[in-house]
Amino acid sequence: LINMGFGNVIMCDINGIICEGDEGLNPGQEEISHISNLNHEHGKLADALKDADAFIGVSRPNLVTKEMVSTMNNGIVFAMANPTPEIMPDEALAGGAAVVGTGRSDFPNQINNVLVFPGVFKGALSVRAKEITELMKQRASYAIASMIPDEELTPENIIASPLNKALPM
């Protein structure tokens, strides 16, 4: 997200917002702290969600409440913990989320790595790439995003289904 030009990306761990200079950061957190949380915010996840445009969760069930979502800026919520997301779609929508996606196939907007891996690997193998670059990942994200025609975009239909026959396999 940072490499694609998104603004102030704030990351959290079990203790809350990760901030440059915090004690106890592991090497990966230390590295990411230098390029994220540009306003040096501190606090818990609830603080990070205030006025946020989006939440991307890959952590644990029932971490986010509809009250937390209600503090977001017309938020986009991707709650991808499986099998139980950080917040259930109906709760996120009740909190005011504009768009909700989960990792589950029984809800709209399934966000699943199966959309990416076959095509990225096929492309990398076809050009004998020695690594998957940021540019390759960005182009894959744009290609997947473009699979839903503008006239078909709705809050419940923002991403192609893993069963879409147009996906490279």
Protein language model annotation of sequence segments:
Residues 3, 47-50, 66, 70, ...:
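A broad, structural surface signal
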Residues 1-56:
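Glycine-rich phosphate/diphosphate-binding loop of Rossmann-like nucleotide-binding domains
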Residues 8-10, 53-56, 75-78, 97-100, ...:
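Structural motif
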Residues 41-94, 128:
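Long hydrophobic segments that form regular secondary structure
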Residues 3, 14, 20-25, 67-69, ...:
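Short acidic, glycine/serine/threonine-rich loops at helix termini
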Residues 81-169:
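Adenosine-phosphate binding glycine-rich loop
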